[in-house]
């Protein structure tokens, strides 16, 4: 029943929003629609206010990085309609330079979600009232959830006893990076326990 409802919702949104939507997909019991970047405000306002939709709650905003694509980033909006008991995912695609319109005017709760997405991926949001980092430290370099961000990071912070403060310095690996792709010496051994010998002895009788 839920799948039929989502199929009907997808058709309804396509009818009402037309070319503002680039595509839609239904998979694993979830509906995802992809909006044109310049139409995201109109799309979200419609699905928030339309009586058949009423997606009034924004649960999360997140980014996804696909480095091989020209538009390498997806911005994903997770929405909830308590009235219809439905969830909906809305996506837009962008690159490192083109900002995504902030949706804070549509969903005030999106402010910190957009800050987190900016902090982790470097995705810009135009019209955001306070677009600054929210999770990483002051002076942090780069955006840690990008696929091209090094595992070790660029700098490390530590407390310096001489300076009596926290300092930042280039990462120094205490040992060479190693590839641990080998069979563990604790795997595959054929250990025979005393109880096994006893059971085998009873079976032989």
Swiss-Prot record:
Compartment annotation: Cell inner membrane
Its GO CC terms are:
plasma membrane
Enzyme Commission number(s): 7.1.1.-
Read off the Gene3D superfamilies from this record: NADH:ubiquinone oxidoreductase, 30kDa subunit
Primary localization class, coarse: membrane
What InterPro entries has UniProt attached to this entry? NADH_DH_suC, NADH_quin_OxRdtase_su_C/D-like, NADH_UbQ_OxRdtase_30kDa_su, NADH_UbQ_OxRdtase_CS
Q: Which reaction does it catalyse?
A: a quinone + NADH + 5 H(+)(in) = a quinol + NAD(+) + 4 H(+)(out)
Quaternary structure, per UniProt, is:
NDH-1 is composed of 14 different subunits. Subunits NuoB, C, D, E, F, and G constitute the peripheral sector of the complex.
Name of the protein in question: NADH-quinone oxidoreductase subunit C
The gene name on file is: nuoC
């Amino acid at each position: 029943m839920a799948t039929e409802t989502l199929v009907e919702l997808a058709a309804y949104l396509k009818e009402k929003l037309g070319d503002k939507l680039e595509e839609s997909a239904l998979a694993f019991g979830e509906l995802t629609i992809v909006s044109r970047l310049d139409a995201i405000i109109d799309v979200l306002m419609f699905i928030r206010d339309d009586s058949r939709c009423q997606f009034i709650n924004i649960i999360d905003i997140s980014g996804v990085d696909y480095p091989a694509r020209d538009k390498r980033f997806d911005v994903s909006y997770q929405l909830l309609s308590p009235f219809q008991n439905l969830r909906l995912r809305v996506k837009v695609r962008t690159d490192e330079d083109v900002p995504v319109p902030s949706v804070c005017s549509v969903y005030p709760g999106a402010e910190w979600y957009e800050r987190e997405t900016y902090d982790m991926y470097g995705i810009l949001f135009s019209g955001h009232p306070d677009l600054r980092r929210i999770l990483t430290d002051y002076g942090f370099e780069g955006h840690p959830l990008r696929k091209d961000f090094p595992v070790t990071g660029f700098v490390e912070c530590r407390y310096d006893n001489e300076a009596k403060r926290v300092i930042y310095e280039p990462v120094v690996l205490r040992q060479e990076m190693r590839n641990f792709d080998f069979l563990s010496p604790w795997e595959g051994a054929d250990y025979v326990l005393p109880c096994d010998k006893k059971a085998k002895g009873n079976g032989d009788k």
